[in-house]
Amino acid sequence: MKTTVKHFNELTPEELYGILQLRERVFTFEQRCSEPDLDGFDKVAYHIFLTDENGTEACLRMLPKGVLHDEVSFGRIVAAKRRQGLGEEVVQAALQAAKDVFDADTVEISAQAHARKFYEIMGFVTEGNVYEEAGIEHIKMFRTLKND
């Protein structure tokens, strides 16, 4: 599995297509999100994605501090296959990129509530109550990177 970290402007058409195709499959068809996936933030994001001979297997986008959240954040996390470790692998790559690309001390996410335990295992802590975003319950979570 190859891990790639690129700003939107660096993506090839093939890479962008693979990312958007995977996101569409999950967010539009599986989860039936009530808001459009293409929200304009992809253009300022770094995209972290895992590929193999089958194409894009997992991806997320990372946004600079102050774009959507007070801290560096990531979202649009998708894995083609569940329970294969792909989600953990792409999140670990994002945590490393937060340090390397943004020199971040903290990462903030708006996690889908059903994935809370997944993120807690990865060192995230919750703040506040569950809220609705795009028709899906979410919770604000943070991870400190200082000791990594």
Label each region the model flagged.
Residues 1-47, 51-56:
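Short amphipathic alpha-helix that is part of the acyltransferase structural core
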Residues 43-44, 68, 133-137:
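Short acidic/glycine-enriched loop/turn segments that link adjacent beta-strands
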Residues 55-59, 72:
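Glycine-rich phosphate/pyrophosphate-binding loop shared by adenosine-nucleotide-utilizing enzymes
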Residues 63, 69-81:
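Conserved acetyl-CoA binding element of GNAT-fold acetyltransferases
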Residues 79, 84-96:
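Conserved acetyl-CoA-binding loop-helix of GNAT-fold acetyltransferases
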Residues 98-111:
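Conserved GNAT acetyl-CoA-binding A-motif
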Residues 112, 132-148:
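C-terminal "cap" of GNAT-fold acetyltransferases
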Residues 120-130:
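Conserved acetyl-CoA-binding loop of GNAT-fold acetyltransferases
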